[in-house]
């Protein structure tokens, strides 16, 4: 056995030499690193990033225009500041791809059904039909939000009740979104709603597992992940009978018939027909569930952040009420009139700015070698993103940048030259909560509409506070995801004034 000791040492030396050579020749080595960058030691940096992404990103933002951080399965390059954000988003798609970056981050080929990745018909529908139909569907969303709140926030008289903030918000958003996605009465079916709600968590569970595996194991473990496939199987019995009947009516009557449904599922069926996939009912089910994934998870986090601000600062409720009631009294309660509720819009935009739901945005995957204007070389295959939270907390972009000022953006719009700017859904190099440019979140118009209806409904019907008045529970970072404090309780009572 002792005769083999020199062999072991020689083998270890060869491995060390190979790792050192790979490190020395890595084109990313020239980019400053937050944390250790040497072979093996970089995994310590990845662990730190997982535990303290906020601190790591802020350190890099304060020091460098471009820096890199270690993730378990890759290096991520991060750009700092509005100028670099603008440069990143303007790089052509054939050089840096948003879709490929999203696929990498969520590991979609293992966590999302493959058919809808090849034929993402739901994205076309969300960009076009859903956005065009926000006004006709406005009162459907209002009715579902009001019904859900009466059931889930059953405050009576002058008694305060306590509810779990995030859980309740998620249930309301799932019902309101489902009203638009699949229509009534399925939007109120408890078992279907449970499947729709848990699908997002199951996709993210799979993505987290895949993100810590080396590439050679991903091909083995990925096909074995059960959760999202199981959710699709469970959703199918609810959706397939509706799809079958609507396809029959479409075949019999053509594009129009009396009482034709006006919802996402109908548009997905028609889009599948348009692209020659009219017989692929599995694709239609996958399209609905993929839409649930993008809508429910992100909107629930976003609105819970805003609800926590409202509960911590109930003194702002009266100003919001006065604006909402004045607009309704003058113009009615419609999608168009809601555009006049500047303070409502500003409250949500400011909450999104201060908190966000991710520390990074404007994600891209380099398809070719790219060189930034400052000379930084990005080799093909590199994951690149902008530092979202740090951008939003930058004093060069916003005064008192870390302070929540609910009417910051409505005050900015008071100037004649600014009144058509600073909408919640607007993006810029300084405001990247929805991404920026042509790849900004296509569902943000629907999401903003839904969240404004929810916030207005709460303000008009309830008083809100935390038991520990005036104190907002701290956010929790899970890698780059920014979570509103899990399990935090919010106090509600019927409006008293």
UniProtKB/Swiss-Prot annotation:
MF annotations from Gene Ontology: heme binding; iron ion binding; monooxygenase activity; oxidoreductase activity, acting on paired donors, with incorporation or reduction of molecular oxygen
Organism this protein belongs to: Postia placenta (strain ATCC 44394 / Madison 698-R) (Brown rot fungus)
Transmembrane segments: 1-21
Membrane topology (UniProt): Single-pass membrane protein
InterPro entries in the cross-refs: Cyt_P450 (IPR001128), Cyt_P450_CS (IPR017972), Cyt_P450_E_grp-I (IPR002401), Cyt_P450_sf (IPR036396)
Presence of keyword Glycoprotein: yes
Subcellular location, record wording: Membrane
Gene: CYP151
Protein name: Cytochrome P450 monooxygenase 151
Cofactor(s) needed for function: heme
């Amino acid at each position: 056995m002792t005769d083999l000791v020199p062999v072991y040492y020689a083998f270890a030396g060869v491995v060390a030499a190979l790792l050192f050579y790979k490190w020395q020749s890595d084109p990313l080595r020239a980019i400053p690193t937050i944390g250790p960058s040497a072979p093996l030691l970089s995994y310590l940096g990845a662990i730190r990033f997982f535990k303290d992404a906020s601190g790591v990103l802020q350190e890099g933002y304060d020091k460098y225009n471009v820096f890199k951080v270690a993730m378990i399965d890759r290096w991520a390059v991060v750009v700092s500041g509005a100028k670099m954000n603008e440069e990143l988003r303007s790089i052509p798609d054939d050089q840096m791809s948003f879709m490929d970056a999203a696929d990498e981050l969520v590991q979609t080929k293992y966590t999302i059904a493959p058919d809808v990745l090849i034929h993402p018909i739901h994205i076309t529908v969300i960009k076009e039909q859903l956005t065009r139909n926000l006004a006709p569907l406005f009162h459907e969303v209002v009715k579902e939000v009001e019904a859900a709140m009466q059931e889930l926030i059953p405050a009576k008289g002058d008694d305060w009740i306590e509810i779990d903030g995030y859980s309740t918000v998620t249930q309301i958003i799932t019902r309101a979104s489902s009203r638009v996605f699949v229509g009534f009465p399925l939007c109120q079916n408890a078992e279907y709603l449970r499947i729709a709600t848990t699908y997002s968590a199951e996709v993210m569970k799979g993505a987290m597992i895949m993100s810590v595996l080396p590439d050679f194991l991903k091909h083995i473990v990925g096909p074995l992940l059960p959760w999202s496939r199981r959710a699709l199987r469970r959703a199918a019995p609810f959706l397939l009978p509706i799809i079958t009947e609507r396809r029959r009516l479409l075949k019999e009557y053509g594009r129009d018939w009396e009482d034709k449904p006006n919802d996402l599922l109908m548009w997905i069926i028609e889009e599948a027909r348009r692209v020659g996939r009219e017989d692929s009912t599995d694709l239609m089910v996958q399209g609905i569930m993929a839409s649930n994934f993008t809508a429910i998870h992100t909107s629930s986090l976003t609105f819970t952040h805003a609800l926590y601000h409202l509960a911590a600062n109930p003194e702002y409720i009266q100003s919001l009420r006065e604006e909402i009631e004045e607009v309704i009294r003058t113009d009615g309660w419609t999608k168009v009139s809601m555009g006049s509720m500047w303070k409502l819009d500003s409250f949500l935009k400011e909450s999104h700015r201060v908190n966000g739901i991710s520390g990074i945005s404007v994600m891209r995957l380099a398809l070719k070698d790219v060189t930034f204007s400052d000379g930084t070389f990005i080799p093909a295959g590199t994951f690149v993103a902008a530092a979202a939270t740090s951008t939003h907390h930058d004093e060069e972009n916003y005064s008192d940048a870390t302070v929540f000022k609910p009417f910051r953006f409505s005050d900015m719009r008071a100037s004649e030259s600014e009144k058509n700017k600073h909408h919640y859904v607007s993006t810029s190099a300084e405001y990247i909560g929805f991404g920026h440019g042509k790849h900004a979140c296509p569902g943000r118009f629907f999401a903003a509409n839904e969240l404004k209806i929810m916030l207005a409904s709460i303000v008009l019907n309830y008083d809100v506070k935390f038991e520990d008045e005036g104190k907002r529970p701290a956010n929790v970072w899970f890698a780059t995801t920014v979570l509103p404090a899990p399990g935090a309780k919010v106090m509600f009572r019927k409006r008293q004034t």
